[in-house]
Amino acid sequence: MSAMSALRREGRRLAPLIHSQPIPSPLTSSSLDQAPIGARSISTQIVRNRMKSVKNIQKITKAMKMVAASKLRAIQTRAENSRGLWQPFTALLGDTPSVDVKKNVVVTISSDKGLCGGINSTSVKISRGLGRLNSGPDKETKYVILGEKAKAQLIRDSKKDIEIIITELQKNPLNYTQVSVLADDILKNVEYDALRIVFNKFQSVVSFLPTVSTVLSPEIVEREAEAGGKLGELDSYEIEGGDTKSEILQNLAEFQFSCVMFNAVLENACSEQGARMSAMDSSSRNAGDMLDRLTLTYNRTRQASITTELIEIISGASALTG
């Protein structure tokens, strides 16, 4: 059974034991008069059950933290190395997130599993914001979703605008070839003027930066080049061979998209594992604090029960000798 399944099981086990009523004190006379024989030890039994469940949950969260740390170390170096793939495109084409186009495709990258803080909610929030920002009578925004968590949120209010849904992307370690095939499939199945890739850029275990990378279609690149600016510098390059400018821009757009996607997937995976490490560490500390409070409650309850029994024994002995 996976760690997440075990955590859910312990949560269900602990849920019936958590209630708004305080644990009855064994010193309460009314409860002692009305309770059946042996009911005086029920308070300590409830606390012991809670302590057992909290200990089990703490073991699971610590194990999940260690697993996330191991996965993060495996991905982090690859993510840092992949940054060199898309940076030349930024130097050549610039980053034009504010370019005005009619057909926008938002590629939202999320995780398939939860318990990783708010990275998925952040990506979905930005994706919805891009949809509203690029809305208009002559404009349309479509979504390409990577990951179960973004799918579950975006499908509620944007189902008709979702073009492609891809899940279990992180099930096996990804390489550039696999991501480039995925990028080609996306380009073949959507019509776009601009692709907006939404992901979380890894900075540290406790920090990630929500990021939007823009990839323009060859037609929009030509239009922006004619208008001047950063893309206007493309006209200064000489074209060698028999390829036309349109063909070169088409190949450039496809290669740029696959490089940006590869980096985005790895960066988001790093952010996911870092956020999961942080969340599980916080959960483990909270479980430890709860365990300390339950231990104190258990000792007090047990001491009160023993004191009550001693009082009864002494009272009975006094009655016999009196």
Regions picked out by a protein language model, each given a short descriptive name:
Residues 2-322:
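C-terminal beta-strand-loop-alpha-helix "lid" module of Rossmann-like NAD(P)-dependent dehydrogenases
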